[in-house]
Amino acid sequence: MMDVSGVGFPSKVPWKKMSAEELENQYCPSRWVVRLGAEEALRTYSQIGIEATTRARATRKSLLHVPYGDGEGEKVDIYFPDESSEALPFFLFFHGGYWQSGSKDESAFMVHPLTAQGVAVVIVAYGIAPKGTLDHMVDQVTRSVAFVQKRYPSNKGIYLCGHSAGAHLAAMMLLADWTKHGVTPNLRGFFLVSGVFDLEPIVYTSQNVALQLTLEDAQRNSPQLKVAQAQPVDPTCRVLVVVGQFDSPEFHRQSWEFYQTLCQGEWKASFEELHDVDHFEIVENLTQKDNVLTQIILKTIFQ
């Protein structure tokens, strides 16, 4: 399953020994894109997301801007298959953007291929920095998952997928205390795509200007530091950790070490390095039904 020959497999230099410039470089995904310049890669990603969302809203049965809480921006977009039923698998997506950019309104990449196969897709908005704190984002995402379970109690499984910062937020749901939400979500799978799971390095990069994370904040919100001790809600719930070949060495290290930590616990974890894709293509390609990751997601849901 794993091929370690990719250009970005973990650096032999521990991040704490890197220069400030190198650490910044490692945690700037657009600098590792080989097919386009950094700025163009970001523009292309946004454009593909906007086009996919516009198409999904125009052609799929949907409920848009549904509030899952009372806070500003606490909304989800729900896209349904043609067959009307509440007994569906639900796929929740949390966008990336280093917890400070991105939007549900440009993140419906996977709606067409998944709804075509009978999966409801929920694109989740959360309050990004600098207005929103990371603790609050984690709370929002937790409430969005509880909301879907309460609204669709006859679901055939809830699957959480996050990209980059969104993968971190999805991973935090492995640690969630559902008792205070009055519901235990029917979590059946996690897809953690090019994520960051130990937030300590972020404290020392320019990304922290908006986030304003203290070391304590970073540690409290690092699933890498906590997941080994957590008990799986359901030992059959699958956790897939995915990274792109052209992700940076630090992104590779983060994903590989998180996978290893999951394995040390009782989690049903697997790891995939996807060939010939970068940090952005890995999600852009979810618009395609024959894409490797799209197929992995569908097989996991319908196995």
UniProtKB/Swiss-Prot annotation:
It comes from the Eukaryota. Keywords: Cytoplasm, Hydrolase, Nucleus, Tryptophan catabolism. GO terms for cellular component: cytoplasm; cytosol; nucleus. The keyword Hydrolase applies. The keyword rRNA processing does not apply. It is found in: Cytoplasm, Cytosol; Nucleus. GO terms for molecular function: arylformamidase activity. Pathway: Amino-acid degradation; L-tryptophan degradation via kynurenine pathway; L-kynurenine from L-tryptophan: step 2/2. It catalyses: N-formyl-L-kynurenine + H2O = L-kynurenine + formate + H(+). The active site is at residues 164, 247, 279. Its EC number is 3.5.1.9. Belongs to the kynurenine formamidase family. Homodimer. PANTHER family: AB HYDROLASE SUPERFAMILY PROTEIN C4A8.06C, KYNURENINE FORMAMIDASE. Catalyzes the hydrolysis of N-formyl-L-kynurenine to L-kynurenine, the second step in the kynurenine pathway of tryptophan degradation. Kynurenine may be further oxidized to nicotinic acid, NAD(H) and NADP(H). Required for elimination of toxic metabolites. This is Kynurenine formamidase. The gene is AFMID.
